[in-house]
Amino acid sequence: MTEAEDFAQLLQKLQNASPALPEGTSSTPTPSSSTGLLPNGKKTKGRVKIKMEYINNKLRRYTTFSKRKTGIMKKAFELSTLTGTQVMLLVASETGHVYTYATPKLQPMISSDTGKAMIQSCLNAPGGDGSDVQPSRTEFTFDSGNGGNGMRKRKMLSDVMSAESSNNSPSMPNFTPFLAPSMAPLFSTFGEDDYNNDESGDDSDSEEASSDIKEEYQGSPTMVKQETTEIDSVTASLQQRIKEAMRQAASNKQAIKKAKITPPSSNMNNAAFLNPFLLQGGANASNLLATAARKGDDAGSLTSNPFLSMGLNLQQLIESAAIASNE
């Protein structure tokens, strides 16, 4: 048996040993149900091709601008560093901020007051409201010579490319001008320290999770702190109102208890029970006893024996008992 036959048999054994996928299944990686992560350890698929159109969602547009602006600045830095090329890059955001990168020879064009005024006048110029946003590509060649002013400008393919792009390719979507006429731009320069910053964004076409976008656009810490303070103040005021209401309810309850009329004494109840058995003479005797008590005559006996203070007719009681026994 030759080596080729041995290799063929080994390959056949490997094919038979590998389990076949059931019908309706694919080898495309799917997120794990328990962790929600793809086999690459991330929640997204990574680099995907996105559609070249204006992003209407403000949060996604802000995130895309931040990543791609930093990415293009890094590319300009790499181009100038690796090839020794003189590079000048300017990016104007929709909030009126201008980000620039320039090599030393071109730095005066963006750092001087004249250059900044020129940039501001160009950005604040009328037009560019979305009717014609096709970029123009122009190439210049500067030759040092003795003739003329020592400079020869050569425009290459700009008109041809503009005509072809307007006739054949679909037009790019409209967008709002970045700067209003009254808005003064703020300049930020990109340097080597920014390039070495690992936390800066990239220009990858990544599929972004909505939760990540919301976390990036939650607002400034000052606004969050103000909202927390307002919530705390409202809670404190509600607690104070509840305490005052409970205190008022307790005081009202106490006042009601004090204002209640005390129930009549047992002596008065007994007198009311015996009123049918009382005669006019007994009532007069009761009045006499009460008058004597006020004058101090035998006051102790009246207070110690409650029956002496009642207008009791003993004869009527005896007659009533006799009638009841006869019946």
Curated annotation (Swiss-Prot):
SUPFAM superfamilies tied to this protein: SRF-like
Disruption phenotype: Mutants usually hatch and appear normal in early L1, but become progressively paralyzed later during L1. Complete larval lethal, typically at late L1 or early L2. Abnormal bodywall and egg-laying muscle in hermaphrodites, but with no obvious abnormality of pharyngeal muscle or other cell types. Five percent of the progeny from hlh-1, unc-120 double heterozygous parents exhibit partial absence of bodywall muscle and reduced expression of myosin myo-3.
Compositional bias (Low complexity): 25-35
Subcellular location: Nucleus
Amino acid composition bias (Acidic residues), ranges on this chain: 191-210
Tissue: Expressed in muscle, varying with age, decreasing twofold during the first week of adulthood.
GO cellular component: nucleus
Chain ranges of the MADS-box domain: 45-105
Keywords (A to Z) from UniProt: Developmental protein, DNA-binding, Myogenesis, Nucleus, Transcription, Transcription regulation
TM stretches of this protein: none
Chief localization: nucleus
Pfam families found in the cross-reference section: SRF-TF (PF00319)
Region of interest (Disordered), ranges: 12-43, 189-225
GO biological process terms held by the UniProt record: muscle organ development; positive regulation of muscle cell differentiation; positive regulation of transcription by RNA polymerase II
Single GO molecular function: RNA polymerase II cis-regulatory region sequence-specific DNA binding
Function noted in UniProt: Transcription factor. Regulates myogenesis, in cooperation with transcription factors hlh-1 and hnd-1. Required for maintenance of muscle in adulthood.
Protein name in UniProt: Serum response factor homolog
Gene that encodes the chain: unc-120
